[in-house]
Amino acid sequence: MDKKELNTKKRGGDYHLTSKGGLMAFYKNQLTKFYKIGLGNKTEFGVTVDEPLINDYLNKRNTISKEGEQRWYRTDNKGDWVPSVTTVLGVVSKGIYFDKWLANHLDYDHACAARDKAAARGTLVHEIAEQLMEGKEVNVENYGNEIVKRVMCFDTWWHDVKPEEIIASEVMLSHPEIRFAGRFDFIVKIEGKNVLVDIKTGMHYKTHDIQASMYKILWDKICDDLGLGEEYKIHSLAGLYLKDGWIKGPNPQYKALKWCPDVVDSAVTMWRYI
């Protein structure tokens, strides 16, 4: 085992991280039990969309179709099919660091397997984070370190930032006048401002700016249609990067993402051309 590889052991009724270097206990007072993490209850953190008009809109059923790696949406089984945000972003290069990662895999099948593993990991971390925001206590004892340590990063960020309110989470957005659709992670109120936060369990890519901007375009358009003011619109964008490489304690990376509507237009145009 690598010296930096962490295993889990139960000791004295509490769960800790251990390694060859000896016992390492992190945040004993912060977590009720190391592998049982809870952020609070629904009332305390406001896990609702208070505005009835938004609730009615968001409760509409969306039809989803998937062809290969592409995902398509339409609202209420009506109208044209539109691509998902991530499908559109498939035409945009993630940059040199992604290209280097791809080059490290021997062939296409290995690259796809690594991608699928990362996607499954990300989906699980997202699901756990959503349960925590709903006020549930989540037991992650049986998950591997790559999941547990990312969840601990989320827990640490939440308690450090202390969002005043959860405006919406895991919402599927579509609009008949916009030629893409998608599901964002959550919008929270931080220091009086509505922040769309996108959870990432991998590296930072410039495409994350475009992705968050696409969600903002959809959300703000819905607010305009419903006659809602700035109180409900998104004021800023952020990426929350949850990694498992830390040793001395959870180290979530919270980064501002750039609002880039012009780049969104270019990406959509390129996707439609291709």
Label every PLM stretch briefly:
Residues M1-A181:
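Metal-dependent nuclease catalytic cores that hydrolyze phosphodiester bonds in DNA/RNA
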Residues G144-K149, V171-I274:
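Nucleic-acid nuclease catalytic cores
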